[in-house]
Amino acid sequence: KAPFDIRLQIRDEGLILNDSGGRSIHFEPLFPGEISYSRSESLWLARGGVAAQHSSQPLSALWQVLPEDVRLSPHVYLATNSLQGPWWILSWPERVPGADEVLPPEPPAYRVLTGVVDGFGRTLAFHRAAEGDVAGAVTGVTDGAGRRFHLVLTTQAQRAEVFRKQRATSLSSPAGPRSASSSLVFPDTLPAGTGYGTDNGIRLEAVWLTHDPAYPDEQPTAPLARYT
């Protein structure tokens, strides 16, 4: 399972890995190619920057399944909780630079999950929305075969608006229901917090295949999956 909410804070005094379970795991700053292990959380955190690890490093074999550009980049961090993988790639989302922006821009002081590499070298790349109601959320996935998938996300406010329109249509119909259920309310927002932290109300509605290299001229007319 990919921890989509995993986030790495990069500070002068150290690194803080936050996950969707509410954990904040602290590490010392890492030099390029260095790997640190948290015994309390059974988690490794690594920094790219070397082509290979020393044979005495327990993760040396797993390191070699990573794409070369990931292994060699000191700006990329990686995490894993198993010697068999997968690696969680921590980088920053793609974005279009501004017209007056100095290139290349400085890397931000945080990293988010941008990909997964399993123990056999198979990859998934995650693409996040740059703007809009779901900015920052994963809305696209590219697998190792080059297939691209679009994840349709909705917010609580969008679902509430759809509910109100459907309810209004139903009540205006001669055959529409006239019962106490017509007073049902679909809130625009969710409670501020839950036992699992803040719920942003974003939900996955459907998954579409948008490109398949094996069938480049064919596009599905229905989603691969739909969630209600």
Where are these regions (language model features)?
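Surface-exposed recognition patches
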Residues: 1-228
